[in-house]
């Protein structure tokens, strides 16, 4: 009897050791076969570089422009997900059709309509801004969105601006203090805040063609502080460039605002998104800091084509310039790094 028990104990120990060894082997094999870009335990930048070197030229260019009204492609071959965006600063937009602004008629896309951001700013309560951002971020996550197109922090300069209600007031300091916790609250949910409309978009009349004239002191003391706080303190993951011009160059591909100030001085490492249809020139968009082009079906070079999105300025026209050797891929790789950083953060 004693020998039988001893024999069983020995068998159990051997079986346990065998199972443990097998599990360890499986774990080691999985660790060896899991690509770096899919391994969340690896450093973010290592994952980005690993994904980048696996992507084709066509896959990289595809990531820099929309595939629908509110989405851009990932890389299905590599398991890199799409990016899905939604309005807005004070409530998640009902689902729309793939190519249109019309509602899609879903029955499970109802969300809270929060008070507009001008009301939030009037509380002078950063804790409330944090709760507001956290709450709207939760709803965006429920709806499987990557990016919320907000908050807006353009400064009130005229009562005739039809979008004043969705901004945070006329005081640059107040807007700077309220936008930071809003962003932090949203991004706690793994959803990116997209701060808009950078910059100098302070009225809606002729907004696509207005060249804004402002001196350096006013630019730095009135119009930029809230955006700077959003980037450097709020750590916003995306930012939307505006429709207007500054120094006679569209802001969606403006060397001074996007490259020199935003990405240079402020160290912004996220992705710059165009306002819908705000891109007007392929080469400027390549070189001057635009990362993701969004728009409507007939924007830009797309009128009369079978697939409008392939004819956006950062789509086939961009690919054609690279293939012809007229531009390199350094700027493209920077754009894709920023988009991958957005995807891995969310």
Role assignments for model-derived ranges:
Residues 1-33:
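Bacterial Sec-dependent N-terminal signal peptides
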Residues 31-346:
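Glycoside hydrolase catalytic-domain context in secreted enzymes
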């Amino acid at each position: 009897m004693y020998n039988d028990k001893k024999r069983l104990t020995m068998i159990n120990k051997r079986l346990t050791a065998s199972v443990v060894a097998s599990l360890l082997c499986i774990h080691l094999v999985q660790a060896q076969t899991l690509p770096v870009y899919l391994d969340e335990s690896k450093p973010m930048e290592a994952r980005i570089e690993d994904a980048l070197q696996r992507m084709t030229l066509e896959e990289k260019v595809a990531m820099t422009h929309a595939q629908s009204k509110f989405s851009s492609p990932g890389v299905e071959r590599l398991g890199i997900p799409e990016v899905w965006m939604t309005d807005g600063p004070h409530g998640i937009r009902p689902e729309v059709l793939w190519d249109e602004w019309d509602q899609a008629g879903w029955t499970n896309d109802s969300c809270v309509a929060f008070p507009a951001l001008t009301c939030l700013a009037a509380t002078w309560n950063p804790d409330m801004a944090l709760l507001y951002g956290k709450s709207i971020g939760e709803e965006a996550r429920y709806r499987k969105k990557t990016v919320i197109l907000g908050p807006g922090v353009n400064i009130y300069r005229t009562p005739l601006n039809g979008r004043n209600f969705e901004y945070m007031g006329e005081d640059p300091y107040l807007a700077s203090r309220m936008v930071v916790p809003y962003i932090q609250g949203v991004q706690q949910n793994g959803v990116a805040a997209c701060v808009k409309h950078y910059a100098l978009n302070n009225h809606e009349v002729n907004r696509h063609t207005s060249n804004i004239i402002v001196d350096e002191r006013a630019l730095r003391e009135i119009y930029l502080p809230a955006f700077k706080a959003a980037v450097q303190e709020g750590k916003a993951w995306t930012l939307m460039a505006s429709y207007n011009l500054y120094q006679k160059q569209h802001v969606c591909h403006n060397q001074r605002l996007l490259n020199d100030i935003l990405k240079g001085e402020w160290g912004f490492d996220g992705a710059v998104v165009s306002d819908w249809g705000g891109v007007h020139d392929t080469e400027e968009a390549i070189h001057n800091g635009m990362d993701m082009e969004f728009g409507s079906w007939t924007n830009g070079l797309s009128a009369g084509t079978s697939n409008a999105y392939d004819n956006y300025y950062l789509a086939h026209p961009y690919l054609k310039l690279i293939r012809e050797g007229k531009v390199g891929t350094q700027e493209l790789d920077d754009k894709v790094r920023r988009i991958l950083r957005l995807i891995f953060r969310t």
